[in-house]
Design a protein with these regions (language model features):
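GH16 jelly-roll
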Residues: 2-265
Length: 265
């Protein structure tokens, strides 16, 4: 895997750098009270979940129409079953747009699951799930959402998913609602780990996740993946993807739930 760990700058074809923001100035704690704490000089934020508060969350003060959004995250170590740690973009209202990165906790020794989804005008159903090929609890990793009129690219140091704009064949695409950056830690033991069969072990609380070096670059470029990036994306799909909505048996022949149009293309 050493030779696969190329930088997201290479994968995304020389995106320009932006200055890291300050959590004190640039985000608002939305829930959880003291369970969300900005530390140090403002570049580190800690979310804590225990039984007194089922987690915490924050959102950016600014909203954006397209851009690149980076967040370094260090996830809950040990037995994190039942927990969900998130980094995502969302607009407001019932017809909202949303681009999700959700990290589903695990029992010690099992891989974290990364759940992704794209909502357009309140409609989702475009999930892809992955088992991470690294331990996201030992070190900080930079997770990026690249959103432009052409495509959505989700990356760590390797591209994880691409969702292309295919409005020409009737696929809804989020391109006209401004979105804010959100992050949260919460208890979802009714579904998060093995479909809810593994519950949160509150004796392991508090559960703690860290965020740092939030960067939002509000201008956009018609970015795509390089040839190297496409090869790495193919590797992730073959080796790490555990769920793909187009392959869901609910969309099989004769189903009442036909596959989305991009699955037929």
């Amino acid at each position: 895997m050493g030779n696969l760990r190329v930088s997201s700058m290479l994968l995304l074809s020389l995106m320009a750098a932006a200055s890291a923001n300050n959590f004190h100035q640039d985000v608002e704690i939305t829930w959880g009270g003291g369970h969300a704490r900005v530390l140090g000089r403002g570049n580190l934020l800690r979310l804590t979940m225990d039984k007194t508060a089922g987690g915490a969350g924050f959102k950016s003060n600014r909203d954006y129409l397209f851009g690149r959004f980076n967040m370094q995250m260090k996830l809950i170590a040990g037995n994190s079953a039942g927990t969900v740690t998130t980094f995502y973009l969302s607009s407001e209202g019932p017809s909202h747009d949303e681009i999700d990165l959700e990290f589903l906790g695990n029992k010690s020794g099992s891989p974290y699951t990364l759940h992704t989804n794209v909502f357009t005008r309140g409609q989702g159903g475009r999930e892809e799930g992955f088992h991470l090929w690294f331990d996201p609890t030992k070190h900080f990793h930079t997770y990026s959402i690249v959103w432009n009129p052409k495509n959505i690219i989700l990356v760590d140091s390797i591209p994880i998913r691409v969702f292309n704009n295919e409005e020409s064949i009737g696929v809804p695409y989020p391109n006209n609602q401004r979105m804010k950056v959100y992050a949260s830690l919460w208890d979802a033991d009714d579904w998060a780990t093995r479909g809810g069969r593994v519950k949160t072990d509150w004796s392991k609380a508090p559960f703690v996740a860290y965020y740092r070096n939030f960067v939002a670059k509000s201008d956009w470029e018609m970015q795509g993946l390089s040839a190297r990036g496409k090869k790495l994306l193919s590797w992730v799909r073959k080796r790490c993807r555990i769920y793909y909505y187009c392959n869901d048996e609910r969309h099989g022949r004769g189903s009442r739930h036909p596959p989305p149009p991009e699955c037929k293309a």
